[in-house]
UniProtKB/Swiss-Prot annotation:
InterPro entries in the cross-refs: LPS_export_LptA (IPR052037), LptA (IPR014340), OstA-like_N (IPR005653)
Official protein name in the record: Lipopolysaccharide export system protein LptA
Source organism of this protein record: Haemophilus influenzae (strain ATCC 51907 / DSM 11121 / KW20 / Rd)
A single GO molecular function term of this UniProt record: glycolipid transfer activity
Predominant location category: periplasm
Gene Ontology CC annotations of this record: cell outer membrane; outer membrane-bounded periplasmic space
Signal peptide, first to last residue: 1-23
Length: 172
């Protein structure tokens, strides 16, 4: 039973690893809380699934989804953990060290821990104060700190920048 608890704790820790690059420095030291209506664990496949009204919190980070699936491949496979969240939409909120909030949403969020690569798919949006980016797909390479937004054949990427926020960014 203790092995099962340790696996769940480790996998749950992976849920928020993607957001720790943006969040308050102290957030990563806070406890991770996952609340859902249902939870299932497949020990053979090392998959934990949380469903219905999933709320994940750690410090200032809050993630809400309909379903979250955390997969931890066998160590010998050479693959790393992945976290997938599904919702209409999945939402997240974080407080940055500079005090500004970041909000995001998408119908699907995928995080590959091995590559430290975050993908928001379908109706993806990132917003900080009044500035925002909308696209069909938004990707973020955590290591390189590079963001890319793509439209699809029907819609284009939309970016809204507020001049006062641009001036504040230049001054810092």
């Amino acid at each position: 039973m203790k092995l099962v608890s340790n696996k769940i704790l480790f996998l749950a820790t992976m849920v928020l690893a993607s957001s720790s690059a943006f969040a308050l420095k102290d957030d990563v030291n806070q406890p991770i809380n996952i609340v859902s209506d249902n939870q299932s664990l497949d020990m053979e496949k090392s998959v934990v699934t949380f469903t219905d009204n999933v709320v994940i919190t750690q410090g200032s980070i809050v993630i809400k989804a309909n379903k979250v699936v955390i997969t931890r491949p066998a160590e010998k496979s050479g693959k790393k953990e992945t976290v997938e969240a599904f919702g209409t939409p999945v939402t997240f909120h974080q407080q940055l060290d500079n005090g500004k909030p970041v909000d995001g949403k998408a119908n699907k969020v995928h995080y590959d821990l091995g590559n430290e690569f975050l993908t928001l798919t379908n109706n993806a949006e990132l917003k900080q104060l009044d500035s925002k980016i909308n696209g069909s797909v938004i990707t973020y390479d955590v290591k390189k700190q590079q963001l890319k937004a793509n439209g699809n054949g029907k819609s284009r990427v939309t970016t809204v920048l507020i001049p006062s926020q641009l001036q504040q960014a230049k001054g810092k």
